Amino acid sequence: MTPSAAATGHEAADEQRLRELRGLTRQLPTGVAVVTAQDGEVAHGATVSTVSVLSQQPLRIGVSLRRGSYLTGLIRQRRVFALNVLSSRQSAVADWFANPERPRGWRQFDYVRWTAHPKAGMPVLEDALAQLHCRLTDLIPLGASDDLLVAEVLDGRGRNGRPLVNFNGRLHDVEFRGVVRVSRDQPSAVTSLE
């Protein structure tokens, strides 16, 4: 076997292993949100399921976006955005803002109920479980294709409901049930569902 053939074989094995590992990460359930931003006559939104609370004091979140995307550029320029946490009734909204064929600019918001944020002006989705107004504090390159946007949560509002969840590459409505925790004093303590 030549060195170049061996390298190609290793690259194929590495790519296969990377696909397997990506499949395993799909077992991690995540909330689904739409990130929105605007700058004057320009507005954009995108569906994400890569959001996490990074710190409690100050309250900061992290959102992973594709490097060089239109939305990433808009947020870098304006430094503020809205994070709209979707309810289980908003799977069509998630699909819409994930559709690369949707109109660009403000027209993409013609098909959803939204209002302009009173301070920053960016669109916020009216039926979202939570609407968070965020200020970009840091942008960290991740690998070859993504950026981690770190943002401070400035204000927000919310409503009751069930979240839309991404699990194994599909959108789900889930019903949460609390767990019963058995006392730590019992040697056979376990946690079980009610």
Swiss-Prot record:
Belongs to the non-flavoprotein flavin reductase family. It is an enzyme of class 1 (oxidoreductase). Involved in the biosynthesis of the azoxy antibiotic valanimycin, which has an antitumor activity. Catalyzes the reduction of FAD/FMN to FADH(2)/FMNH(2) which are subsequently used for the hydroxylation of isobutylamine by the isobutylamine N-hydroxylase VlmH. It can reduce either FAD or flavin mononucleotide (FMN) but prefers FAD. The enzyme has a strong preference for NADPH as acceptor. Keywords: Antibiotic biosynthesis, FAD, Flavoprotein, FMN, NADP, Oxidoreductase. InterPro entries: Flavin_Rdtase-like_dom, NADH-dep_flavin_reductase, Split_barrel_FMN-bd. The keyword Lipoprotein does not apply. The lineage of its organism: Bacteria, Bacillati, Actinomycetota, Actinomycetes, Kitasatosporales. This is NADPH-flavin oxidoreductase. PANTHER family: FLAVIN REDUCTASE, FMN REDUCTASE (NADH) RUTF. It catalyses: FADH2 + NADP(+) = FAD + NADPH + 2 H(+); FMNH2 + NADP(+) = FMN + NADPH + 2 H(+). It comes from the Bacteria. GO terms for biological process: antibiotic biosynthetic process. GO terms for molecular function: FMN binding; FMN reductase (NADPH) activity; riboflavin reductase (NADPH) activity. Its EC number is 1.5.1.38. Gene3D superfamilies: Electron Transport, Fmn-binding Protein, Chain A. Homodimer. It can form an isobutylamine N-hydroxylase two component enzyme system formed of a flavin reductase component (VlmR) and a monooxygenase component (VlmH). The keyword Ribonucleoprotein does not apply.
